[in-house]
Amino acid sequence: MKASIYDFTLKELSQLLKPSFRAKQLYLWLYAKYKTSFKDMQNNFSKDFIAYLEREFALRTIEITHVRESVDGSKKYLFKSLRDNHTFEAVLLKMKDKKIDAETNAILEREKYTVCVSCQIGCQVGCSFCFTQKGGFVRNLKASEIIQQALLIKEDNNLPLEKALNIVFMGMGEPLNNLDEVCKAIEIFNTGMQISPKRITISTSGVADKIPILAGKNLGVQLAISLHAVDDKTRSSLMPLNKKYNIECVLNEVRKWPLEQRKRVMFEYLLIKDLNDSLDCAKKLLKLLNGIKSKVNLILFNPHEGSKFERPSLENARMFADFLNSKGLLCTIRESKALDIEAACGQLREKKLSQQI
């Protein structure tokens, strides 16, 4: 199959296409006008150039096969690769964003959209609480397949170019195990879809030796660490990766992460009933993160088929959060969006096309 045009950065296309200004024109058609056929670009390009594009490149290499909508307005998308028919999922999260008008002091409310993208089909990390690992690991996604998730979701919801998206690499897969394609996708999100790196978050299970590699690329993205435990024994039982990269190893690399002023590293902490949700765990977490500019995002375990874990009470989560906040460690409780359609944190996996998502 021909290379997808979405796999090329603006710089790469500028070097490939002659004259080079055609690359910017092509980017406009691809990312601002959502064109799905090269023939639809004839207003800008000659027939010969259109023929060249059709001969050398593919446009869409994935397609939406199913959409399921939550009562909260979030949507779970099942995508199919047109190359090998493997499937993967992504989620559109709709949230209310409040902002104070500088002139009137009025509170303005608007919708904020976040796309949770997958970077792999399946996952190699094997976290025991995560549904994705039950399908095993299939392959890495190409940058084009990551980009098209956001592009097709934006198109499906009729969102204009100027409507900013947040992108979180919190879907299927470990981003640092597909670092080259993830970094290329981030560059294209920025130059193509006009998504600022500040709106992009990479969440990692803690592949410690690749954190400095990501830092060295100076992408300006936000870093989130899936911590989920305060001692190595518990974390290793939840995340086998901890046997290779233990808590202290991960935290040592996080301490070196370049942070802009007023920015913090996010630590995601999955609360599981009677395992890691006690006040004693909160005290140990406070001690662990001492000296790191950080914030904690608590996630209540989202149940899925075959899981042995239970969801803690909201009261317990609030107790945990209140303690950390009272000690000066910023802590929030993540609202479980799309729980009714199994699109919340840890609930995505590859589906057979015959399966209902």
Swiss-Prot record:
GO terms for biological process: rRNA base methylation; tRNA methylation. It is an enzyme of class 2 (transferase). [4Fe-4S] cluster binds at residues 123, 127, 130. Residues 109-340 form the Radical SAM core domain. It holds the Pfam family Radical_SAM. GO terms for molecular function: 4 iron, 4 sulfur cluster binding; metal ion binding; rRNA (adenine(2503)-C2-)-methyltransferase activity; rRNA binding; tRNA (adenine(37)-C2)-methyltransferase activity; tRNA binding. The active site is at 89 (proton acceptor), 345 (s-methylcysteine intermediate). Its EC number is 2.1.1.192. The keyword Iron applies. Disulfide bonds join 116-345. Binds 1 [4Fe-4S] cluster. The cluster is coordinated with 3 cysteines and an exchangeable S-adenosyl-L-methionine. Transmembrane segments: none annotated. Keywords: 4Fe-4S, Cytoplasm, Disulfide bond, Iron, Iron-sulfur, Metal-binding, Methyltransferase, rRNA processing, S-adenosyl-L-methionine, Transferase, tRNA processing. S-adenosyl-L-methionine binds at residues 173-174, 203, 226-228, 302. InterPro entries: Aldolase_TIM, Methyltransferase_A, RlmN_N, RNA_MTrfase_RlmN, rRNA_lsu_MTrfase_RlmN/Cfr, rSAM. Belongs to the radical SAM superfamily. RlmN family. This is Dual-specificity RNA methyltransferase RlmN. It comes from Helicobacter pylori (strain ATCC 700392 / 26695). The gene is rlmN.
